[in-house]
Design a protein with these regions (language model features):
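Fe-S-dependent hydro-lyases/dehydratases of central metabolism
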Residues: 1-501
Length: 501
């Protein structure tokens, strides 16, 4: 939309102040900070909110540490996470050769917030998120010495130069436990080059680590899938069921320090027990090389776009009909994630531009028969519990249901980002007014939304849903901004933009 000259809009979120005091103890990491926030707020606690980190503790955190914390704000369901652009940020940009781009951005002295949560960094201990949710958090100490079969260090959450150097310090001169497979994926070409230059990469290799390509890899099941029934300790941000590529595996989320210590011992280990000095001096100048960046052509509109057979057209949506009818194609429990809705693993990632192919796998982790039934029925409705669409902002989790002609999702509650994506694609997100009505629906019930176009156009927030099979009606809530009303009426954002040109 922005590329076509339009605007990016969202509902104004509330702001939660995460006030940090104290300083992290040795062996306690930024990952433990965000795991503590998840423990407090849960995976639903950030919906409709911006997380703003303030307080004297913020000054003790480097930019990579702040990035780790902000990265997992998505697991809270938050709109975004904010740290101040202060002198720490300026020093980081200077080291990257970009100080000229620095702009100071600090909270006003009299800033007020919708809520405040205080966390004393000095009181934190190493934490671990147990399977299969990032908010299933315990201390490493109380969890005990769980035997580890695999340790994976990296991902967009924990793969910075700072993270990698601490891992290298722990591994240097030691050997990975014989029962553990250790894989390390540095987070960028820059980080990998610096590790190779200073010898840290060799320390990892000599300890027994396998070095993986810088990529969206093991976190999403692209390689390193654990063996059957394995325990895998990982530094990524999500441990949803089956996401690793092995449904029977247990994925535990930990810091880099905990992961490296556990790789040596063979069991979940508190890194504070190590004698290693984990101090890392951030370089005054990072190794940066832009020689592989391909600059856009001056006449960009004249560039030829080559589409192979795996690049299929964008699914087309119809304008909202006067009345919608269809079967309840699937009934789901709470916390259905975007991984459930549209799995994304080594088998499916090559088809990200091929929605018809991806449709064959939509919601198959819940019910393998769903895609075939949805196509045979010509579309219909989905019934869901709380927090439907939890997880990332994966647009395919809305694009593929659009292709399957899903007309609406009736749920107890929605994850914010996914709800917005449904609206963007013309799919109605309806919330049960009385959660008990969820129990009255079953698969194959015939559903009708009478006069739905008239209701949406009139800004009506209470939408009656008729169950024609069982002969009852219940009330659902449909809260849309005027702009979102236009999107739903047009059949999605793209249709709306086209109609305005």
């Amino acid at each position: 939309v922005a590329m076509s000259g339009g605007t990016y809009s969202l509902l104004c979120p509330s702001v939660t102040n995460i006030k940090l005091t104290g300083t992290l103890s040795r062996g306690v990491a930024a990952k433990d900070v965000i795991l503590e926030v998840l423990r407090i707020l849960t995976v639903k606690g950030g919906v409709g909110k911006v997380m703003e980190y303030t307080g004297p503790g913020v000054k003790t955190l480097s930019v990579p540490e702040r990035a780790t914390i902000a990265n997992m704000g998505a697991e809270l369901g938050a709109t975004t996470s904010v740290f101040p652009a202060d002198e720490n940020a300026r020093a980081f940009m200077r080291a990257q050769g970009r100080e000229q781009d620095y702009v100071e951005m600090l909270p006003a002295a009299d800033a007020t917030y919708d809520e405040t949560i205080e966390i004393d960094l000095s009181s934190l201990t190493p934490l671990v998120a147990l399977p299969h949710m990032p908010d299933n958090v315990r201390t490493v100490e109380e969890t005990g010495e769980i035997k580890a079969d695999q340790v994976c260090i990296g991902s967009c959450t924990n793969s910075s130069y700072l993270d990698m150097m601490r891992v290298a310090k722990i591994l240097k001169g030691k050997t990975v436990h014989p029962d553990v497979s250790l894989v390390i994926a540095p987070g960028s070409r820059q980080v990998l080059g610096m590790l190779a230059k200073n010898g840290a990469l060799n320390d990892m290799i000599q300890a027994g680590a396998r070095v993986a390509e810088t990529a969206c890899g093991f976190c999403i099941g692209m390689g390193q899938s654990p063996r059957t029934n394995a325990v895998s300790l990982r530094t990524n941000n999500r441990n949803f069921f089956g996401r690793s590529g092995t449904k029977s595996a247990g994925i535990y989320l930990v810091s880099c320090e905990t992961a490296a210590a556990s790789a040596l011992s063979g069991v979940l280990t508190d890194p504070r027990a190590l004698d290693t000095d984990l101090t890392v001096d951030m370089p005054e100048t990072f190794l940066y090389n832009d020689n592989l960046i391909i600059m856009p052509a001056e006449a960009g509109n004249d560039a030829e776009v080559v589409r192979g057979p795996n690049i299929q057209p964008f699914p087309q949506a119809d304008a909202l009909a006067d009345t919608l009818t269809g079967k309840a194609l699937l009934k789901m429990e709470d916390n259905i994630t975007t991984d459930h809705i549209m799995p994304s693993d080594s088998k499916l990632l090559p088809f990200r531009s091929n929605i018809p192919k991806l449709s064959e796998y939509c919601l198959t982790p819940v019910d393998e028969t769903f895609p075939a039934r949805a196509k045979a029925a010509g579309g219909g409705f989905l019934i869901a519990g709380h927090n439907y669409g939890q997880g990332s902002s994966r647009e395919h989790a809305a694009l593929v249901p659009l292709y399957l002609k899903i007309r609406g999702v009736i749920a107890k509650s929605f994850a914010r980002i996914h709800k917005d994506n449904l609206i963007n694609n013309g799919i109605l997100p309806l919330t049960f007014k009385d959660e008990a009505d969820y129990d009255r629906f079953d698969v194959d019930d015939e559903i009708e939304l009478a006069d739905i176009r008239k209701l949406v156009a009139g800004g009506v927030t209470t939408v009656p849903v008729k169950n024609l099979t069982k002969g009852f009606a219940c009330e659902t809530e449909l809260v849309l901004s005027p702009r979102q009303q236009g999107m739903i009426l047009a059949g999605g954002l793209i249709n709306k933009i086209k109609s305005e040109q």
